[in-house]
């Protein structure tokens, strides 16, 4: 299991990356189709504050969100 501190470090790095690349695309604040970690709802977001594969939102693979072992709302 990934430790909380590791997740926090990852989130900080993602936040820095997103702040430097805020745009409507890969990792932006909007809803880019393949955004790799934005604050929005990227269709294939790999981990951001939205609905990616592992972010604070409704991530699929181990974020703070719902399915697959998230810390938030269970499976």
Curated annotation (Swiss-Prot):
Source domain of life: Eukaryota
Keyword Secreted: yes
GO molecular function: double-stranded DNA binding
Keyword Magnesium annotated: no
Residues with the Tyrosine amide modification: 29, 39, 49, 56, 64
BP GO annotations: defense response to bacterium; defense response to fungus; defense response to Gram-negative bacterium; killing of cells of another organism; neuropeptide signaling pathway
Key words, A-Z: Amidation, Antibiotic, Antimicrobial, Cleavage on pair of basic residues, Fungicide, Neuropeptide, Repeat, Secreted, Signal
Tryptophan amide modified-residue sites: 73
Localisation per UniProt entry: Secreted
Tissue specificity field: Expressed in hypoderm.
GO annotations of cellular component type: extracellular region
Cysteines joined through disulfide linkages: none
Signal sequence extent: 1-22
Induction cue: Strongly up-regulated upon D.coniospora infection.
Entry's family note: Belongs to the YARP (YGGW-amide related peptide) family.
Entry function: Antimicrobial peptides that have antifungal activity against D.coniospora. Has weak antibacterial activity against Gram-positive bacteria M.luteus and Gram-negative E.coli.
The name this protein goes by in its record: Neuropeptide-like protein 31
């Amino acid at each position: 299991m990934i430790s909380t501190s590791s997740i926090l470090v990852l989130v900080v790095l993602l936040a820095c990356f997103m702040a430097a690349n805020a745009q409507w695309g890969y990792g932006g604040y909007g809803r880019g189709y393949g955004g790799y970690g934005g604050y929005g709802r990227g269709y294939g977001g790999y981990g951001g504050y939205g609905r990616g594969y592992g972010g604070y939102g409704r991530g699929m693979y181990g974020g703070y969100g719902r399915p697959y072992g998230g810390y938030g709302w269970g499976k």
